[in-house]
């Protein structure tokens, strides 16, 4: 017996240990259940209210402390507030921790209440209680509640997901186990059909009693809407509000209310995007989310693992005209792609001839041609078919070994003849010299699509003679040329990818003249989502639909980092154990396997393996015919829209009735799924994660053998296959599952087929025959493991890059939230001035003149100390003294702002306060005018201190948004550029971390300086009353200027009179008949009947500009001489 076996025998395996830990909780629930069951309906609801109050009372003291601290914070000096806010944060964390203690104490009673609520709805058509206001409000909105006299009557049937449902579920013991696991912040793995949705009601109900919000996350909007409608009445019965964000538009009042509900359902993407939108809001009332308290993720593996490969990005258009480039270079790329296809087809024909020879040398030559064809066009259907023939794949792999050996020293021999090389596994394309020559054939410049060696060019420039100005001009030209060519090469690469690696009706569909992405996991259209980095535009150009404008990232986050923000995170799925390590590494989530309520009776058969797709699909159709004749419903799972439509056509030709559920037909989802369990029904579905909960079987169907699952291809992920299998055999029902696989399937072609192909060859396997063995099924699973490991690597790398960004995002978003809410903005402004003082002192530590100039530019103030003092001070003393003086200056200027504004605000509020809610205050920094909106009453009550806060908010928000947007662009560019570090045997991630830190530091420094410069200069423009001497001098100047102007006008008029006399007389038309009456705003005629006096024409006289030389000849500017005061 090995050590592991001995330890397992001694302590039990992980599942046994987990269940042992949870069992006491379940025993307590079962112990308290009889007393809960004995309560009347009203007493049951009263018990819930009692527990709600108990939870609030448990933390009442701490909440009172926070309230008290918040009240007095505005009266404190800025310097004192930091300590108070730190204390508030500390107490709020303590409240969250104490909540967990009281929830654990309340768990047995609360779980028992929810279980008995489910029982009462299952056993009674109506549940009657004494009506309260919450019941009356519900009755006005929903059909399942009605009010009769003082009674609220809850029906046990309602609509969910488009179907009428009657409540018939009561929690089993295993579901109580699952509920405890979810409350503990772990992942519950429960077999498909074990009622995961019902399990969630237990921890959701318990945690919602805190009134801090519970988020239930689903993989698609159909499920989020359905589950909120399905489970909602149970929560509402106990006075809890329920809503679903997917029912409301983003940034709407309705969506904000959905987040304020005790329980909020929604899709993972919408939760993430709402977070990003909140961090782009410009007013607190635009925020929709509250604190991230507790989240339960349904199909947790799909959300936290599969979807985690793609970051969430909010982007906006940028005026760069890239779309023209994609359309401009499309013809060039089409020429190259068509040339490559023709070449690869010819190579394949030649390879077939040579490989049929008896001469081994000729066979080897043919094998090289075959490999060359494979590197140039791996998705060629004729090539895929040829590779499935006996011995062919093995021969090509042998050739590949030669080219891959010695660090790919000989690879150029295989690829030089091609126009470009495709690496399908890594999703990349590389142009060869031959391809570049063909691309540039119609241009005059042979390097039109070649990136110059910028490093050597700049190095040569440094060694050249010439002035600094000349060198700089040449450097700018080199950089500009590189930028243009870089954009050009990038466009070509993305177009090549679009033409060779992305297939219509597979990765995307074209609907309503738009390219729409299909989610590879769920088969649904991802409306509003676009491929990044210009790839979407390339596909639009390829499909000849409108190429949308280029976009720039405004906000981004990975799902991993979004969900890690929750205080407590848990999830449920039928298939998490295979990824338990990843869940722990990234999310610190433990996976607990919950036993099934009844043994699984489903027959999972071995994979049936064919050589070609054609044979496979014919076999699938034959299998469907046999199963439907036996009276069994059949669910056919496909991996793409294209395959589902192909099978649909084949079934139609055989006159077999069927339903199709895919990205193009998702509107009929509820109806199709509801029918999928009926006798002899055939349903084709692109992906079935989370859809099968509605497949119910009749007795006839169960007697016939239950639901039959047919997989038409093994998915990249074992979990997706397990989800498909799990649609049959739910709750002990009979059923079967089998996968049909061919060597031409993508998974087999890329990762598995060499061993299986070799085995088929050894067995003398003929076309049309099927191979079925447990060992082969295991081989397919090993191929899936390879893909999963590869995908895990992608996710982990994405997270490592986003972790760098995440720390920066937290700093920026925290500062932005402080500015938006206004509570802590004073502290942040204080820190901004301090950081700017530090940066100025550090930058000019040895240069007093530079220091003085920088102070004037940034703080608009003179140096507070002499050159001798500056040189004698230590750096920290210099910073402290400078900060002290800068802060004094800032406070003095803000005080001045309030003094200037107060009389105006007082007059407006006291005379017209009822008419206006907000007032716009013009504030200038001497360069531009900022119109700052402020609440009129608040400005009046605070003696205009609110105006200062509004000014701070608008400037800080503007600077953060501008700086962060530009920083994201630079980070995108950095991430692409650091990949080249791998050619120098350096870790790109390490370079990225170092460079991104420098970029962030520079961005924050610039942001601080710009913010400080505007805030320090901010003032309300006023016209100051001049002194008597100034008034007299001004009048004298104005008289002199007026005299000069009168003289100039008289001379001009004399010239014009002469010109008029010399010119021929012109004919004038009487325009009076076109005159219309003028009316005022009330519609009254304002035009007098008396003849109007003739108005003199307005002539444009030559006027002196403020910055022009003064006409008096003094040499000064007009504004500083005779124009002063004008």
UniProtKB/Swiss-Prot annotation:
Keywords: ATP-binding, Cell inner membrane, Cell membrane, Cytoplasm, Membrane, Metal-binding, Nucleotide-binding, Protein transport, Translocase, Translocation, Transport, Zinc. One of its GO terms (cellular component) is cell envelope Sec protein transport complex. ATP binds at residues 175, 193-197, 694. Residues 1060-1126 are annotated as: Disordered. It is found in: Cell inner membrane; Cytoplasm. Part of the Sec protein translocase complex. Interacts with the SecYEG preprotein conducting channel. Has a central role in coupling the hydrolysis of ATP to the transfer of proteins into and across the cell membrane, serving as an ATP-driven molecular motor driving the stepwise translocation of polypeptide chains across the membrane. Gene3D superfamilies: Helical scaffold and wing domains of SecA, P-loop containing nucleotide triphosphate hydrolases, SecA, preprotein cross-linking domain. The keyword DNA repair does not apply. Its EC number is 7.4.2.8. It comes from Parabacteroides distasonis (strain ATCC 8503 / DSM 20701 / CIP 104284 / JCM 5825 / NCTC 11152). This is Protein translocase subunit SecA. Its main location: membrane. Zn(2+) binds at residues 1110, 1112, 1121-1122. Its cofactor is Zn(2+). It catalyses: ATP + H2O + cellular proteinSide 1 = ADP + phosphate + cellular proteinSide 2. Belongs to the SecA family. It is a peripheral membrane protein. SUPFAM superfamilies: Helical scaffold and wing domains of SecA, P-loop containing nucleoside triphosphate hydrolases, Pre-protein crosslinking domain of SecA. The keyword Repeat does not apply. The gene is secA. May bind 1 zinc ion per subunit. Residues 1064-1080 have a biased composition (Basic and acidic residues).
